[in-house]
Amino acid sequence: MLIHEAELGFIHIPRTGGTSIEYALQNKYKNDSCQVNHQPQDKAVQTIQTVTHGKLELQKKHASYHELIEFCPTYKYYVLVRHPLKRIESVYRFLVHMKLVNTEFDKWIYRLIYGYIYGEPNAGLDETPYLTDVSYGPRRQVEYIGEAEVHKLEDQTIWEALKISPIKVFNLPNVLPIIWTKRSIKLVEKYYEVDYEKLNYD
């Protein structure tokens, strides 16, 4: 997400609480000429012509640092990260909420991670997604970050850094129970090893 008025960028890593940051930034910097695109988009920034608003800048919701600096190399960038286990729990709640998964967590987690390992990012889905971008799944958080200033969701420091008021949106219910086993934790730790190491999670 790019805020041209403030010359800043926010890297929204999926399932880290970034939607709340986006809303807070949109509340502070109201600009009708830019819009975060929730649908899959190839480029980080695309300009389209609309009947009602004229030119509109569509910004890719989950663009990485490296994608965004191509358009705004001098901006200051921020990113929010989350503990890998909590992030996976959020992925599960999101997919259940979207009715793309109905499998119990302890079976689903293996399908998901082994799907990532073997290049099948949709292996964790029970239904085919329609206009829901799930291509981000296999990516580790560090693949998004680049030179952005890192804040942890657990520390809640990003609000002050961006000078925005804390809000919480898109809080998903726990419809199906989430039960971890030692084996499933180990599997996630192995797959997201670089996130644990570089983001100092244990």
Predicted features by range, described:
Residues 1-202:
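Membrane-interface amphipathic segments in extracytoplasmic regions
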